[in-house]
Amino acid sequence: GVDKIFSVYNLDQRRRMRSAGSSWYSSNLAFGSAKKVPGINSNVTLTHEERLAIALNSGNESSRQALLDDKQLKDLFTPRDSNGNAIGKSEWGDSALQAVLDMLSAKDRQVVQEIFDLVDSFWEDVYDDNGNLVTIGIKNLEKQESGLAPPKVKALPFTSNGKVIKGGYYPLKYNPHASEQVAREGEMNIENALVGGYPGSAMTAHNHTIARKGSGGRPIRLGLDVLMDHFEQVTHDLAFRQAVVNADNILTDSAVSDAIKDA
């Protein structure tokens, strides 16, 4: 699970990733964990958590493009004078993103890929040793809805200090604290708003692309709390979606509706 993935970090590193009530995944990593991004003119520092989140959002084409379109990152990577006035164009782009990815340590790279793999494990059905279905996967849950097994988000490999990370799906969520538009949307994952409210549906290639195209430069949530939110939402989706759909079908059936009205 997630705890095992993060166990590669020592106790001090874990302490820096910990906040009250959120284990090692918080909206901010505290106490000296920020580092300057090397090789750029703008004086940008990123926390350990932000660096990991940027890497996790680089693992597929749609999320990577939303990351590059992020207006807050473009503003952050704009060189400024001592008064805060812009003195040049934003440096945020492929080169700056690569500079951030090259800041990852070997442990970071291991953690990032293991998170991709863990998220991906929700795609297929899970069976016990006797071949009995334990949990339906997102692919077959979607197939029950549409009749067709959808393609999943395709992993986009990327490098960090010359080492290849295979990439994978990671939930694309936006920061309500940095955008009035996102705040008005009730801190809701844009993916879910666009695909009918089913968290698992966002892992399909079509719906994840819709979410990215609808980003409009919104600032991405660069916190590992996104991961825990995703696990909670998807496990709930896998457990209860079919029951909810079946109940809705019954209640909206005209014969049932008429019987209820006549009761």
Give the residues covered by each predicted segment.
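Structural preference for well-ordered, secondary-structure-rich domains
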Residues: 1-263
